[in-house]
Amino acid sequence: MTQLNTQFGKVAVLLGGNSAEREVSLRSGQAVLNALQNHGINAIAFDPKERPLWELNELAIDRVFIALHGRGGEDGTVQGALEFMNLPYTGSNVLGSALAMDKVRCKHLFKSAGLSTAPYTVVDAKKGFDAAAIMQQFKKVMVKPSHEGSSIGMAQASTPQELEDALSNAFKFDSQVLVEQWISGREFTITVLGDEVLPVIEMTTPNGFYDYQAKYQATTTQYHCPADLSPADTEHLQAMALDAFDLVGASGWGRVDAMQDQQGNFYLLEVNTVPGMTEKSLVPMAAKAHGASFEQLVVRILEQTL
């Protein structure tokens, strides 16, 4: 029988929620819950879709592990509620969460700070747009709803018609959409844990890009950890990731995604403040390459609330 670990008190794992990433969050949260309980921590699952947050007080919760992805859980909303309730929680604060979740604001920040990021434009559902002019400027683009994760609502476009179709779909998720120059090359992700940067992971997929299907369903997606990069490139990419993480005000733990074009230049994509923690997730993979088990990773994240 596992000895009870009392230093954390009673912990609620927030999972599920109302976002388009609910199913992924349920899997992440269950994995986190199992790890905490295996470590002897008094932890329970709490789904904000099923019950109001104020019940956390009734349950005498001491701290919260946030495993919510997307809107309502990763955008500063639940963080603000927990701040109001004086409950310590994992990950970034209200501002860091809100900024990182907003792809458009992140791009503006990266650009203004001189960090390398792909050329882009922003399309608003309430305003008109010229698909032909955008495609003439960029040739090939990636379309991303500003506030979604797990590649939800994302699509490539190489013609004005494809762009119109991609925007029409993206507008179902968000009124502001990021249209980004397509970078053809290698895709990487870098985990930040406390003040450490973990080994870089490279993802390869026949899907064209690392989309929802490649992330959670495909058996053809391959992961290389640590990535096959020179020591200089690895150091540069890790430093760039840490700069981006700090710039948006993220803290505690998270993941930064980046690309390398065929000329060897690196470009920042986005910062994730509550990355996936499923069996296929990248943060546990990086932690394992760093010598930490999944349980050790989860406990280390929770320790940041003490």
UniProtKB/Swiss-Prot annotation:
Keywords: ATP-binding, Cell shape, Cell wall biogenesis/degradation, Cytoplasm, Ligase, Magnesium, Manganese, Metal-binding, Nucleotide-binding, Peptidoglycan synthesis. It is an enzyme of class 6 (ligase). PANTHER family: D-ALANINE--D-ALANINE LIGASE, D-ALANINE--D-ALANINE LIGASE B. Gene3D superfamilies: 3.40.50.20, ATP-grasp fold, A domain, ATP-grasp fold, B domain. It catalyses: 2 D-alanine + ATP = D-alanyl-D-alanine + ADP + phosphate + H(+). Binds 2 magnesium or manganese ions per subunit. Residues 107-303 form the ATP-grasp domain. This is D-alanine--D-alanine ligase. GO terms for molecular function: ATP binding; D-alanine-D-alanine ligase activity; metal ion binding. It is found in: Cytoplasm. Its EC number is 6.3.2.4. ATP binds at residues 134-189. InterPro entries: ATP-grasp (IPR011761), ATP_grasp_subdomain_1 (IPR013815), D-Ala_lig_Van_CS (IPR000291), D_ala_D_ala (IPR005905), Dala_Dala_lig_C (IPR011095), Dala_Dala_lig_N (IPR011127), PreATP-grasp_dom_sf (IPR016185). Pathway: Cell wall biogenesis; peptidoglycan biosynthesis. Mg(2+) 1 binds at D257, E270. Cell wall formation. Mg(2+) 2 binds at E270, N272. GO terms for cellular component: cytosol. It comes from Pseudoalteromonas translucida (strain TAC 125). GO terms for biological process: cell wall organization; peptidoglycan biosynthetic process; regulation of cell shape. Its cofactor is Mg(2+); Mn(2+). Belongs to the D-alanine--D-alanine ligase family.
